[in-house]
């Protein structure tokens, strides 16, 4: 690194890097000039005397800042703490935009109520704490939230909404008989397929009322079928044979791949029924899930189905030594599913790669006396810091 004495045109010049362009399939040699924390010029052979500081990139790859479109902050630590630590992790991995899924209910701020009161608190706790650009997707959990969709778009700029399809009988970590308490919704509320339909109708009504924003307004779905998961969890837990499945293999079997595929079918038909064309199918983890999504794209060509994949589902399989530390929803899958996900990604059948970052410290993830027990582990792990390096 060197410093120039004369009046500079640029604050920083990074010389001799191989630049990666979005949507490109080749890299090219260039220099990058920066002024006022913004890229001012990308070109070969920029004169070093025009910069206050010159840094030799020595042939390293230079990427644009990464958008991690699927993160979670504030689940296992207070939001005001996670905003700092997890955005630092994002920046360390080259992520410069963090889009976080948020909801009312247990975890997060651990309270229910309307978003008109809840979301300003989220923004207040976040302000000045993130080290990268950030935004939020929100999940309408009850009728009031559906009614608030236009307000959330117009007043707060929220354009993406979410449905957790498996919350019908499952909580964050496994089966649950107290869903209303977990979700913190009223006695007359149900978080079920009918609610999913009404969320879609609410999102589409907002799109129609705001045609200038319609392209940006979308709905994301975590596609797993609660009833299938409940039944298969009982089957797996009931098996006491010497050869019974354990660890990540058991958890994968308890939330089988066809549970994802069936949920994709349901989500797709509801999107068709409600005329909602902007659908994001979040983190399919298996061949069956992706194939179901591709089939639905053919059946309903008027719907723009986006398909994402997490870096965890590309890097890990059920044989991972991480064991219960890799518990996540949807589960880590067998190797054949992982290989298929890579094939689908390289074939352009998956639209973006995300982390689904939900940092959970090891002592919280699974206490020592539960080591080896996948059912007692909490779900989720970090990942935004290795999103780009792993690829």
Q: Model regions: which residues?
A:
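Short catalytic-loop micro-motif centered on adjacent basic/acidic residues
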Residues: 100, 135-138, 278-283
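Active-site mouth loops of central-metabolism enzymes
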Residues: 69-81, 109, 132-145, 252-258
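Short, acidic/polar
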Residues: 79-87, 143-152, 266
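Short beta-alpha connecting loops at secondary-structure transitions
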Residues: 326, 371-378
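Metal-associated gating/positioning segment near the N- to mid-region
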Residues: 49, 57-129
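Histidine-rich, glycine-flanked metal-binding segment
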Residues: 2-63
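Divalent metal-coordination and catalytic microenvironments
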Residues: 17, 32, 37, 59, ...
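Histidine/acidic residue-rich metal-binding segments in metalloenzymes
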Residues: 147-353, 358-361, 369
């Amino acid at each position: 690194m060197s410093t120039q004495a004369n009046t500079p045109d640029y604050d920083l010049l990074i010389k001799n890097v191989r630049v990666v362009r979005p949507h490109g399939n080749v890299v090219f040699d260039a220099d990058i000039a920066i002024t006022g924390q913004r890229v001012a010029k990308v070109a070969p052979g920029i004169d070093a005397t025009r910069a206050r500081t010159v840094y030799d990139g020595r042939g390293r790859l230079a990427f644009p800042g990464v958008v991690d479109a699927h993160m979670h902050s504030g689940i296992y630590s207070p939001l005001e703490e996670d905003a700092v630590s997890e955005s630092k992790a994002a920046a360390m991995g080259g992520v410069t935009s963090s889009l976080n899924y948020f909801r009312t209910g247990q975890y997060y701020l651990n309270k229910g109520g309307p978003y008109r009161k809840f979301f300003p608190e989220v923004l207040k706790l976040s302000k000045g704490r993130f080290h990268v650009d950030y935004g939020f997707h929100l999940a309408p959990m009850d009728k009031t939230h559906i009614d608030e969709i236009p307000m959330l778009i117009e007043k707060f700029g929220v354009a993406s909404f979410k449905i957790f399809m498996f919350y019908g009988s499952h909580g964050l970590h496994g089966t649950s008989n107290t869903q209303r308490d977990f979700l913190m919704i009223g006695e007359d509320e149900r978080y079920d397929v009918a609610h999913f339909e009404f969320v879609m109708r609410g999102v589409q009504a907002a799109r129609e009322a705001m045609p200038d924003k319609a392209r940006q307004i979308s709905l994301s779905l975590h596609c797993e079928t609660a009833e299938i998961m409940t039944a298969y969890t009982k089957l797996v837990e009931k098996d006491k044979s010497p050869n019974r499945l354990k660890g990540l293999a058991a958890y994968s079997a308890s939330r089988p791949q066809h549970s994802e595929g069936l949920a994709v079918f349901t989500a797709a038909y509801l999107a068709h029924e409600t005329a909602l064309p902007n659908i994001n199918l979040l983190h399919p983890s298996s061949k069956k899930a992706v194939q179901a999504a591709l089939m639905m794209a053919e059946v309903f060509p008027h719907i723009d189905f986006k398909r994402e994949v997490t870096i965890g589902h590309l890097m890990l399989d059920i044989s991972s030594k991480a064991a219960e530390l890799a518990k996540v929803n949807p589960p880590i899958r067998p190797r054949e599913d992982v290989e298929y996900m890579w094939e689908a990604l390289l074939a352009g059948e998956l639209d973006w790669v995300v982390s689904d970052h939900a940092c959970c410290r090891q002592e919280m993830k699974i206490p020592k006396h539960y080591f080896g027990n996948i059912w007692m582990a909490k779900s989720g792990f970090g990942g935004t810091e290795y999103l780009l390096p792993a690829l």
